[in-house]
């Protein structure tokens, strides 16, 4: 099995100055691991969701000035893209690795999914583990811990996805850099698999909704 766990030098990619310079290092150092993670987890996600999952590695092609502060591989049930669909992500900032179920702002039907989550609020609050986190913007590293959100705060998150055009909803885990570099490959992959098996619960809600 190829090495997929991120090392210190992978995280250090995001300290390289300049768009071209950082992208060169990212392509050489980080992208091969993202591609390997994609190949490893696409069959698992296909199996546990019942949808054939396709791999999409972030290319950052639209960037012309500012270098990326994070990068990722996404999994969605379409070859054509993932941003408009409920999807899964594995990626990293210079401080941590993230594993997400994601509804991001490009989704034309995220409002309908937000309504569905609001209806299932009590169940979701009980099912999501206390050490999981929520995000309302995939472009920022800030998160809200599930253990610190009461029902009203969670409801506000779900309502925001319905009413705010740029609103997003992501749920999953963050693994601190310091922990990741101490893991072996198997431990790292096991953490990701456990997270995916948990957030698939949210993905299944979107499968039930005909939108």
UniProtKB/Swiss-Prot annotation:
Source taxon at top rank: Bacteria
Matches recorded under SUPFAM superfamilies: YktB/PF0168-like
InterPro entries found in the cross-reference section: UPF0637, UPF0637_domain_sf
Signal peptide: none
Record-linked HAMAP family: UPF0637
UniProt family annotation: Belongs to the UPF0637 family.
UniProt protein name: UPF0637 protein BPUM_1363
Gene source species: Bacillus pumilus (strain SAFR-032)
